[in-house]
Amino acid sequence: MSNSLEFPWLSALVLLPLLAAFGIPLLPQSRWARWYALAVGALDLGLMAYIFGWHYDLRDFSLQLAERYAWVPQIGFHWSLAVDGLSFPLVLLSGLITTLAIVAAWNLTHKPRLFFFLLLLMYGAQVGVFLAQDLLLFFLMWEIELVPVYLLIAIWGGPQRQYAATKFILYTAAASIFILVGSLAMAFGSEGFSLEMAELGAKSYPLALQILAYAAFLIAFGVKLPVFPLHTWLPDAHSEASAPISMILAGVLLKMGGYGLIRLNVGILSEAHVYFAPVLAVLGAVNIVYGALAALGQNYLKRRLAYSSIAHMGFVLIGIAAFTELGLNGALLQMISHGLIAAVLFFLTGITYERTHTLALDKLGGLAKQMPKAFALFTAGSLASLALPGMSGFVGELTVFLGLITSDAYAPTFKAGIALLAAVGIILTPIYLLSMLRQVFYGAQDPGLVLEDYLGDLRPREMAVALCLLLPILGIGLYPRLATQTYDVTTVAVAAQLRSALPTEIVQRPLLPVQPAQVAALPPTD
């Protein structure tokens, strides 16, 4: 891979927030930190729009705008960045949600310099994860992102913030070990040491080594997505994190897990994926049903939304496991859609807490009269989350279903079982979301909740944040190509690569595709 442009545009996207963060301590007044952070976030987002609008070719499935500079040549470590259809939409999603999170944190008064410093560090690291093409650089950016999140929860979180932050860092740090194990297995597992993803994808590995690396990456990315039973850090983190951090946590950080699965497990370890894909499909179905059932039992608003996120990420797993272009399309669309929907719901949840000082569902109620704008936008976000036709959630889930049903890699009974379990989750989703709306906004207001003088509807700044998230949700729902055109050609190429790893004659079994050699051993049928 060689430098394809004279100006290192992708390096600018990563380094701008990372380096600009160190300018915050130099500001003469703390109140300037929010303006500074907003300027950096908006500039980076504008730079993304310019780069992808003028220098990116939507018709090309290969890596574009590639940059490669020797960093530590003694160990083959390069500053290697590139973008394709897998990373393009997620980079934009990261830029949009993080910039809006800065606006959402506008009234922060406790240590604003440190808060926005950490937020910009996290921003740059997220973009770096999506653009990195060197496994060691990918790992480095992944690790840089962990520390700001830990501190942002531990310092600005709720009463149990230390517990939630510690649980987050223990889970994610342990997961990082598996990224390192998988990376080293691939780097040393074939002739010629390399950390470059493109070079690793072109090499041939023993199947046993592929399975080892795949399992390691699956555990690491399964924690981040998260996948049941590696999910238990997420409800605690969401419960204690402030609203702006929950926006980024649900909107961007979870997508890093899905991106890692597609980029490494599917894109490079496609032969091992043949064996693990049925497991992913089952885990996806379990995620959907478990997340929906757990959400039903939550009395705390943010915990209900956290378990909802777990359920929605199950569709990503099923899409990845489908072996079809539609499945991969649906997985990416579900990540984009959920990122926007979760961000707006957690933002509006934070607004509700600011007004009422509680998120206990049995203590809320009757807020629709005092907060009609918040009620309308919260309802719109909830309807998008339950996959109402005309909104992005519907398109994402429908595409995943079609990808699974049209797959010829599984027996019809297996596909029907997965689809049935997913359908159970879809039926439960409106139950826990609509009951949540009823408990928060309908009924009689608890007289001990808060004085009416403290209740106020959305202000213009808050309306702007919510609408900037809801409009893309509606736009993608009505015209999905707004999102799918960014990755269509890439998913076609990845799906073709996956199908080349399947047996020449696909023999359908309830769980695993059967290798051609096993066909001869089967008794003849009448």
Swiss-Prot record:
It catalyses: a plastoquinone + NADH + (n+1) H(+)(in) = a plastoquinol + NAD(+) + n H(+)(out); a plastoquinone + NADPH + (n+1) H(+)(in) = a plastoquinol + NADP(+) + n H(+)(out). It is found in: Cellular thylakoid membrane. GO terms for cellular component: plasma membrane-derived thylakoid membrane. GO terms for molecular function: NADH dehydrogenase (ubiquinone) activity; ubiquinone binding. Pfam families: Proton_antipo_M. It comes from the Bacteria. It is a multi-pass membrane protein. Its EC number is 7.1.1.-. Signal peptide: none annotated. Its main location: membrane. InterPro entries: NADH_Q_OxRdtase_chain4, NADH_Q_OxRdtase_chainM/4, NADH_UbQ_OxRdtase, ND/Mrp_TM. It is an enzyme of class 7 (translocase). The keyword Iron-sulfur does not apply. The keyword Acyltransferase does not apply. Belongs to the complex I subunit 4 family. HAMAP family: NDH1_NuoM. NDH-1 shuttles electrons from NAD(P)H, via FMN and iron-sulfur (Fe-S) centers, to quinones in the respiratory chain. The immediate electron acceptor for the enzyme in this species is believed to be plastoquinone. Couples the redox reaction to proton translocation (for every two electrons transferred, four hydrogen ions are translocated across the cytoplasmic membrane), and thus conserves the redox energy in a proton gradient. This is NAD(P)H-quinone oxidoreductase chain 4 1.
